[in-house]
From Swiss-Prot:
GO molecular function: ATP binding; ATP hydrolysis activity; proton-transporting ATP synthase activity, rotational mechanism
Primary role: Produces ATP from ADP in the presence of a proton gradient across the membrane. The catalytic sites are hosted primarily by the beta subunits.
Reactions mediated catalytically: ATP + H2O + 4 H(+)(in) = ADP + phosphate + 5 H(+)(out)
Claim: Signal is one of the keywords in the record: no
Gene: atpD
Domain of life of the organism encoding this protein: Bacteria
Record's protein name: ATP synthase subunit beta
Membrane topology note: Peripheral membrane protein
């Protein structure tokens, strides 16, 4: 640790987000946080390289306009530290832990450095366990692993945000766990919308006029598109640090990253400014290392778990691009949202044939769950294969067996829809959390033909199969 006398350095060069600082004597360690004043505001820099004997190259966490050569910079002697604990819930903070929602300072339990070691092998839990989300289609066909990493794919307007909100809501209700949302390099407007939607759907209390009946369940950390690459490259770590603190207190935490591609993109911008020779497609040479350092910290320990849901943008829809390809290596499950399903009015618009999970194995979920999931996929796959024939020749040309398959598949499709708690304000129908046993029982009955007598409409936007039967009776009574 440096003494006070040699903790002061001076700016020698500013190139965009990269600042060189000269220190007399003791050099700050790599990843140390340096501080200076810029137009009355605190500007934080993070040491990235040592150049020669007395100069360090640092990355700015905010804009560097207004910095001048010769300006004083202080070495804090530690990495960037951010507030953690329940005081962060319902608040929006930035990469360096400052509140940006204009609701006063964050009442934190303590602070924690954003750079942490991944948990050791001895601390990690080895049991494969499912995180029940209460969302039928996810729990049946692409179940999430506790402490796993899930990739969320979907275009604009197919319901990613609503699905994320429902997951936050359900994890809080079913597991008593908190969530952390890291907005990495996305639109500021979307972050603002999300913040207000969380308050409207009672996921969070409004910090400006708190409602005592609403308890905040989610902390928000933002480093948006307009921010310098330093902030975007580190904001995911800030969010993860808050999540790790909740996990170490014995909770099952959900950690959302929107968007993991922007984390890589920011790393690539910083890398070029630091003068590193780029690798494939112009990405940073340390692409896999950076991604690994983040992803390896997301895991289940003997105390609790962090389950991460990561929205993944695929540049030009090219899955072989190094950025998405590197993130795929870490995923345990993928949830793909499909526009064609959303167009049918089936929400959540999860594609049952395109979403996958490593947990869907008889050894983890049990024989019955596995068999039902495979039967459901088989029925849907057969329906998909028959769609061309139906489009050209019509339903009448199908064999009796195929007609039955199509009828069941359409019921299965509709039964995969379900009303969400967070969408109650738009739909007017109360949300449903469906237990795993009820989900398996419902789909098992459907594919076995127990409910062939019920109309399709009975299965649309209900929770359990019992509700579908009730709805079927109601529809029959209305028709009569």
């Amino acid at each position: 640790m440096a003494t006070a006398a040699n903790q002061i350095g001076r700016v020698t060069q500013v190139i965009g987000a990269v600042v060189d600082v000269q220190f007399e004597g003791h050099l700050p360690a790599i990843l140390n946080s340096l501080e200076t004043k810029n137009g009355g505001n605190r500007l934080v820099l993070e040491v990235a390289q040592h150049l020669g004997e007395s100069t360090v190259r640092a990355i700015a966490m905010d804009t560097t306009e207004g910095l001048v050569r010769g300006q004083e910079v202080t070495d804090t002697g530690a990495p960037i530290r951010v507030p953690v604990g329940e005081g962060t819930l319902g608040r929006i903070i930035n990469v360096i832990g400052e509140p940006i929602d204009e609701a006063g300072p964050v009442k934190a339990d303590n602070v924690r450095a954003i750079h942490q070691e991944a948990p050791t092998y001895t601390d990690q839990s080895t049991e494969a366990e499912i995180l029940v989300t209460g969302i039928k289609v996810v729990d049946l066909l692409a179940p999430y692993a506790k402490g796993g990493k899930i990739g969320l794919f979907g275009g604009a307007g197919v319901g990613k945000t609503v699905l994320i909100q429902e997951l936050i809501n359900n994890v809080a209700k079913a597991h008593g766990g908190y969530s952390v949302f890291a907005g990495v390099g996305e639109r500021t407007r979307e972050g603002n919308d999300l913040y207000h939607e969380f308050i409207e759907s009672k996921v969070n209390a409004d910090p400006h006029n708190p409602d005592p009946s609403v308890k905040s369940k989610c902390a928000l950390v933002f480093g948006q598109m307009n921010e310098p690459p330093g902030a975007r490259a580190r904001v995911a770590l800030t969010g993860l640090t808050i999540a790790e603190d909740f996990r170490d207190k014995g909770q099952d935490v959900l950690f959302f990253v929107d968007n993991i591609f922007r984390f890589t993109q920011a790393g690539s911008e910083v890398s070029a400014l630091l003068g590193r020779i780029p690798s494939a497609v112009g990405y940073q040479p340390t692409l896999a290392t950076d991604m690994g350092a983040l992803q390896e910290r997301i895991t289940t320990t003997t105390k609790g778990s962090i389950t991460s849901v990561q929205a993944i943008y695929v540049p030009a829809d090219d899955l072989t691009d190094p950025a998405p390809a590197t993130s795929f290596a870490h995923l345990d499950a993928t949830t793909t949202l499909s526009r064609s399903i959303a167009e049918k009015g089936i929400y959540p618009a999860v594609d049952p044939l395109d979403s996958t999970s490593r947990m869907l194995s008889p050894l983890v979920v049990g024989e019955e769950h596995y068999a039902v999931a495979r039967q459901v996929q088989q029925v849907l796959q057969r329906y998909k294969a028959l769609q061309d024939i139906i489009a050209i020749l019509g339903m009448d040309e199908l064999s009796e067996e195929d007609k039955l398959t199509v009828a069941r598949a359409r019921k299965v499709e509709r039964f995969m829809s379900q009303p969400f708690h967070v969408a109650e304000i738009f739909t007017g129908s109360p949300g449903k959390f469906v237990e795993l046993a009820d989900t398996i029982k419902g789909f098992k009955g459907l594919v076995e033909g127990k409910y062939d007598h019920l109309p399709e409409a009975a299965f649309y936007m209900v929770g359990t199969i019992e509700e579908a039967v009730e709805k079927g009776k109601k529809l029959a009574a209305e028709a009569a």
